[in-house]
Design a protein with these regions (language model features):
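C-terminal beta-strand-rich structural cap/linker in extracellular carbohydrate-active enzymes
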Residues: 78-83, 184-188, 663-700
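Conserved alpha/beta catalytic core and glycan-binding cleft of carbohydrate-active enzymes
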Residues: 389-391, 406-558, 578-635, 639-650, ...
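Beta-strand-rich binding/interaction modules
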Residues: 40-42, 46-58, 142, 147-162, ...
């Protein structure tokens, strides 16, 4: 044994390395300049022989400990470039020394992390393929402040974690290490030794890819390699900060689509402005529908690779469709390899075990008082916006975040310092999150699903509120579906459920939803409604049309395999919405809506106007929720002029009976609804008729109506330049990333030859 080498051995530290308790291996292993040369040490548990190759020379290492600790003293004064040559049996492997590379996380980044303001934590924590000093490898970093030690186990080292010991940063408790030669596609986990000696095998919280099998191993992925083609879209995304833009969202699950191409073509053809996708982040149990997120920084591998999901978003943007992702920052699942007691202590979850468990799902609730947990979640939101170009996040289960007593009985929760039930840490976190997102990503939509009636949820953080852009209008959906579930004969007794929404329509910025959670499939929707199959279909069309006309953004989820008639209906509905500024420009202002007929409960009819500052842009909507049509129905109008029907849910091309108004209506000077002028129209059973209102003095436009609509659609969607791409062009932009999970779609239209009775006397009762 070389006495000089032996004399440099730090035996207590070597013992800590051998027994898996060393937290600063870079201080011991790697190169170190001494008065006798450059000392190089390494730990290779299963190696028979180890040498150091430097230039054209090879230096044999001595085994200083039988556990596999090797060292050599090079007769040089400066640290040279070198590699290890490791012999195991007949196999020889060359590798660079991971401890020859300095820490890649700066002191400033570490301080920001400890303060809860490291919004780009996703760039350093996790596993990132990088090149340092001409050497390619992967930078690993994980936060585990209470761990005794942390190792990396994976494909690259035969899952022997004790051979790859991570270095602890003392201020933050981040363990980091650059491992040369590790490439994208490598599977890995962290071996975390906790107090008491137990070793936990954990997936990477910041990992960019993961398996969805029960083991849930993390996978090294390069999320920066993709070449985006949506520059025009990203430059214009800030426009959605202006709430005067139309927002029509199609909610869908990725598993419903055979390919990305199919989804992109459908959305572009149907003229939706946005799509809300789920499930996106990796999850393990299919039964959860993707709402028990396992890997927050990884798109689920069920439907393709990291690059495949980036291609999907890129193609959607090129087709003029914004992308909203479902996000679950309220709770996380309890998996042995997940976030629960990540380093042997409650790190991500609330400290009190009794209050850490979600009362309904049995999952764990986040500790929003921890700066590092805030880093994890805020950085995650920034990650999806900045790395995957997401245009919005829909936050699930916000109630569980806001209320300490959510789902709990007295005695099962602890009040805050003021003796109330608000989660003060969660409130601060949400304000912090929304402020950061708005500053870094103007135009990104933050949507809350919250049913606890938290006041002014969508008011600004500057006004000391939470700063969401929108919240789901659960009250509107509940009232409408309850009303529609009644037999039309009984609906007059529930008329206020139809009209009540306008009493609170301006309390928040709402998204009206008839999504999968609300109505399920089309068959499920039909099962909620009374009447014959034809009447059910008519009511589905009426519900969608009423939603599109009511103040608020829109979200729907009709089956992708919907009947052709309904597909045409949805496209025309979106076209009408996009073409008429009155249907969206003043959604949040009282001046944008005016009742015409509010109390026609005997007839089951409501009528209202949607308006802008220009009278000629006024739209009149008349909705009949009775099972019988009205042949000569009088409606008061705002002024003398022409009233042209631009949409009717009973049109035969939609599967209706054709009770429509083909001729332009001239307002007559006959008082109705306390208005000087009125029109008489045909009103279909269980249907909606929509009219444009042109004042008498307004000059007739020279262009055709069809041309006007198309121009208006183009104007409201200025960055949707690729919406008219050919199918061939779309095919070149994407490749299949989804699997097909088909469900038999119900036949939504079933015409009959039976004549529909026309009710002429409005005073007569059915």
């Amino acid at each position: 044994m070389d006495e000089k080498v032996y004399g440099y051995m730090d035996w207590p530290r070597i013992e800590a390395i051998v027994y898996g308790e060393e937290t600063a291996p870079r201080d011991v292993m790697g190169p170190r300049i001494t008065q006798d040369g450059v000392l190089i040490q390494g730990f290779f548990p299963d190696a028979e022989e180890v040498s150091v190759i430097s230039g054209k020379k090879t230096y044999a290492c001595e085994k200083e400990d039988e556990a596999g600790y090797f060292a050599v003293l090079l007769p040089v004064r400066k640290v040279p470039e070198y590699r290890f040559l490791i012999k195991m049996g007949e196999t020889e492997t060359e590798c660079y020394d991971p401890y020859a590379f300095p820490c890649q996380i700066t002191e400033e980044e570490e301080k920001a992390f400890c303060a809860g303001v490291y919004y780009e934590a996703y760039k350093k924590l996790g596993a990132h393929p990088v090149e340092i000093k001409g050497v390619k490898g992967t930078l690993f970093a994980v936060w585990a402040p209470n761990a005794v030690s942390v190792n990396i186990a994976g494909d690259f080292n035969g899952w022997i974690g004790r051979a790859t010991i991570m270095h602890r940063m003392p201020m933050s408790g981040i363990f980091e290490l650059f491992v040369p030669g590790v490439e994208a596609g490598t599977h890995y986990k962290y071996e975390i030794k906790v107090k008491g000696g137990e070793v936990l095998l954990k997936a990477d919280p910041y990992g960019n890819s993961a398996d969805h099998d029960p083991e849930g191993a993390s996978v090294v992925a390069d999320v920066s390699a993709f070449q985006w083609n949506d520059g025009d879209w990203m430059k214009e995304r800030h426009r959605f900060d202006d709430r005067k833009q139309p927002v029509s969202i199609y909610e869908t699950s990725l598993e419903e689509w055979k390919s990305a191409e199919e989804l992109v073509e459908f959305l572009a053809e149907e003229d939706f402005t946005h799509v809300e996708l789920h499930p996106v982040m990796e999850y393990l149990d299919d039964i959860t529908g993707g709402y028990s997120t396992y890997a927050y920084y990884a798109p689920t591998s069920r439907f393709g690779s990291v690059a495949d999901f980036q291609k999907l978003v890129d193609a959607l943007h090129q087709a003029g469709v914004g992308v909203i992702l479902d996000w679950t920052p309220a709770q996380f699942p309890r998996y042995a390899s997940g976030l629960e007691k990540f380093d042997g202590t409650p790190l991500y979850e609330r400290q009190n075990p009794a209050e850490a468990i979600h009362p309904f799902w049995g999952t764990l609730l986040y500790n929003y008082g921890s700066p590092m947990v805030k880093d994890f979640l805020i950085s995650n939101a920034c990650f999806w916006a900045e790395v995957y170009h997401a245009d919005g996040l829909r936050m699930d289960d916000v109630d569980a975040m806001l209320y300490l007593d959510y789902g709990r009985n007295p005695g099962e929760w602890t009040p805050n310092i003021y003796g109330t039930n608000e989660n003060l840490d969660a409130l601060e976190f949400l304000k912090h999150l929304n402020s950061v997102i708005k500053e870094r990503n103007p135009g990104l939509l933050l949507v809350a699903q919250e049913n606890g009636l938290w006041p002014e949820l969508t008011d600004s953080v500057e006004n000391d509120h939470l700063g969401f852009d929108y919240k789901w209008s659960g009250g509107w959906t509940k009232d409408l579906l309850e009303y529609l579930s009644k037999d039309p004969i009984e609906r007059k007794n529930y008329h206020d459920q139809l009209t009540m929404s306008m009493l609170y329509a301006y309390c928040e910025h709402y998204i009206l939803t008839l999504g999968s959670r609300d109505v399920g499939t089309l068959k499920d929707f039909a099962d909620k409604l009374p009447g014959s199959e034809e009447q059910k279909n008519a009511q589905i069309r009426e519900a969608y049309a009423y939603m599109m006309l009511h103040p608020g953004c829109k979200m729907m989820a009709p089956d992708k395999d919907m009947p052709k008639e309904l597909e045409v209906f949805v496209k025309d509905l979106n076209n009408m919405y996009l073409a008429h500024p009155a249907l969206y420009q003043l959604d949040d202002e009282y001046d944008g809506f005016e009742w015409v007929q509010l109390m026609k409960y005997e007839e089951n009819v409501i009528a209202f106007m949607r308006k802008t500052e220009k009278p000629e842009e006024t739209v009149l909507a008349v909705c009949n929720f009775a099972a019988i049509p009205y042949e000569n129905y009088n409606v008061g109008v705002p002024f003398a002029g022409k009233y042209k029907e631009i949409f009717n849910s009973d049109d035969k091309k939609y599967g209706g009976n054709g009770v429509v108004n083909t001729r332009v209506k001239a307002a007559k000077k006959a008082e109705c609804d306390e208005r000087e002028y009125s029109i008489t129209l045909k009103l279909p059973a269980l249907g909606v008729a929509v009219f444009t209102c042109t004042p008498e003095e307004t000059e007739k436009k020279p262009a055709a109506e069809h041309s006007q609509i198309k121009k208006s659609i183009t104007k409201t969607r200025t960055v949707r330049k690729a919406a008219g791409k050919t199918k061939a062009a779309v095919k070149t932009a994407v490749k299949p990333v989804t699997k097909k999970v088909t469900k038999e779609a119900p036949q939504i239209v079933n015409k009959t030859e039976e004549k529909i009775p026309v009710k002429k006397d409005l005073t007569e009762k059915k």
